[in-house]
Structure formats: C-alpha cells, structure tokens
Amino acid sequence: MGLKDKAFESAEKADELVKTLSLGGSITAATVCLNAATVCEAFDRPREALERYSEAKSIYEDFLPPGDARLGGLYNNMALACVSLKEYDQARELYQKAIKIMSALPGGKPETAITYLNLANVAEAQQGLENASEFITDCLQKAENLLLDESNALDGNYAFVCEKCAPTFEYYGWFMTAKEIKRRSDEIYERT
C-alpha cells in the first residue's frame, strides 16, 4: 500500500471514529475534516480538499474565538486549495483573514510572512508578474520585515519558515533576503 492509499485510509478511519463517538459538529470533527482536506490537497484533489476545509470552517467559525490560530491555519490551507482551483479572489480573501489573525498572535510574524508570500504568488497567478509587480513588491517587503524582525524567536519553527520562504524571495529576485534568511535557518539547524 502506497503513501496515498495509507493517507486516505487514515482519513477515512478518522471520519468513522468521529461518527462512532458521536463527535459530529465538534472542534474535534472540524480538525478531522481539516486533516482529511490536507490529505486531499497533498494528493492533488483540491476540489475535495475545499469541500472538507469548508466543513471545518463552518465548525471552527462557530466555536473558536475569532483570533484563534487554528482559524488562521485553516484559512491559509483553504486558500491553497482555492489557488489550485484558480479561485484567486477567494484565496486572497482567505489569506487576508489569515494575516489578520496571525499578525495579532504572539510569535505570529513568521506565519504572517508566509501568508504575504502566498498573496504575492496569487497576485502573479491572477494578474501576471508585470501587472502585479507593485503589489508583489509590497508583499515581499512586508514578509521581509516580519522575518528579519529582531523579536522573532530563533527556534526550529523560525528556521523552518525561513527555509521555506527563501525560494520565493529568490524567485522574485530578492537574492540578498533569500541568502540572509537561509543563513539564519542554517545557523539554527546547526545549533540543534
């Protein structure tokens, strides 16, 4: 059995457990939906992913405080599925919601930076590089400021985020920023 089959089997078992334990409509059920959606997205089934994310969203928005990090993560993941389906306006709206949440959280700067880079990518996909250049530059500047902020905890999460963001900065020609955040990432990994 390949990874894909195992992942979908695990998601189905989790869905069955939610039903067996009568957890439908709970935060736990929403998290199971979110995890199943992530499996769908990972294996190129964005339409199914978006349906499962929508299930999670309706529960999370009903039961979680508006600034809960889980909502921010959901909006980010849901936006990625929208991008895969070329539903760019919805993706941008979800990324903006994620930014509002993540930027208000303690230690949320790295995650907010990722979201700004995702917004830049959406703008390019929707409008083209030339037409979106001003918006992209603005997003890159915000992401750079957030990642280079001295208040960031220089931990494994920060290293991971920097490592993941560096290629996007390189893609847009921000080579010095890419080099600096990659250096920071490498230093943290070497220490641990």
Where do the PLM segments sit?
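Conserved alpha-helical positions within TPR/SEL1-like repeat arrays
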Residues: I27-A42, A69-S84, P110-E124, G156-E170
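A detector of tandem-repeat and repeat-rich interaction/domain scaffolds
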Residues: P46-L50, I59-L64, E87-E93, A98-I101, ...
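Structural signature of alpha-solenoid helical repeat scaffolds
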Residues: L21-G24, F63-P66, G107, A153
